[in-house]
Amino acid sequence: MEAATVQRFQYSSWNDLRNFEGKPRGSLRYNTQRIKEDKRFRVVALTLDKRRDHRLRSVSDKNSSALLETGSLLHSPFDEEQQILKKKAEEVKPYLNGRSMYLVGMMGSGKTTVGKIMARSLGYTFFDCDTLIEQAMKGTSVAEIFEHFGESVFREKETEALKKLSLMYHQVVVSTGGGAVIRPINWKYMHKGISIWLDVPLEALAHRIAAVGTGSRPLLHDDESGDTYTAALNRLSTIWDARGEAYTKASARVSLENITLKLGYRSVSDLTPAEIAIEAFEQVQSYLEKEDGMARPDGL
């Protein structure tokens, strides 16, 4: 029976990497002091800035043959970004020591997309809580669970999934539902690993949700009049008021506004998922370095 349970909750992410092209936009207004920049991130920021400048120049260059050298393509900006991502993953992995990571944040903040990238970079397995719940409910979608069984049933299944993941698995990256943070028992399970909060401006989140629709997000279904963006922003603001404080319990905070400032971009929508994943690794490493007298791993 145990083997059957493990099989039912197994979920691989590697075949879904085509979803990376979507740029996550997100959720929050949170007053805090600017994250202290360290030498490592300044190097990353400078490299990514140069990469972005190169990408813009390349797009406007009509002579595409200039990208060829001795019969092969030069390294693309994507390749450079992946090299930086791989390097940051290699740096943080000794600190993790096999511990799992749980991504938390408002709905639509990019937890699944960023989580897949982080898992792939570390060689970890990726799980999506919503997908596990749907599998446990014999393929019933999240929206249908809310409609036919109620939110309380969904929350119970969510807690069951987090419990199984925390007790039965190591070296995994888990994308949680936006409301996972409201139940204290869920934090008990997530704190067995490292929790990472993707902090995204509410306005950016509302724009993204308005663009893709609210069909798969039952908590955004309402009868408010007005345009979709305004309705989404109003509902998200209400949800944030109820959950905002809970997100601060996470081990590490990844602020998309801070990344945007560091890299000199105009908007959080300019960020790529890989850039967000790089910042997540930075914040996780910073947290673990400060964690109760933890020594730096040998060779670092």
Curated annotation (Swiss-Prot):
UniProt pathway: Metabolic intermediate biosynthesis; chorismate biosynthesis; chorismate from D-erythrose 4-phosphate and phosphoenolpyruvate: step 5/7
Phenotype of gene-disrupted mutants: No visible phenotype under normal growth conditions.
Protein EC: 2.7.1.71
The reaction(s) this protein catalyses: shikimate + ATP = 3-phosphoshikimate + ADP + H(+)
Pfam assignment, any one: SKI
Cofactor binding note of this UniProt entry: Binds 1 Mg(2+) ion per subunit.
Root EC class: transferase
Keywords: Amino-acid biosynthesis, Aromatic amino acid biosynthesis, ATP-binding, Chloroplast, Kinase, Magnesium, Metal-binding, Nucleotide-binding, Plastid, Transferase, Transit peptide
GO function terms (MF aspect): ATP binding; metal ion binding; shikimate kinase activity
Activity regulation, free text: Inactivated by heat (37 degrees Celsius).
Cofactor(s), by name: Mg(2+)
Statement: the UniProt record of this protein carries the keyword ATP-binding: yes
Family of this protein: Belongs to the shikimate kinase family.
Its biological purpose: Catalyzes the specific phosphorylation of the 3-hydroxyl group of shikimic acid using ATP as a cosubstrate.
Assembly information from the UniProt record: Monomer.
Protein name as it appears in the record: Shikimate kinase 2, chloroplastic
Organism: Arabidopsis thaliana (Mouse-ear cress)
Gene: SK2
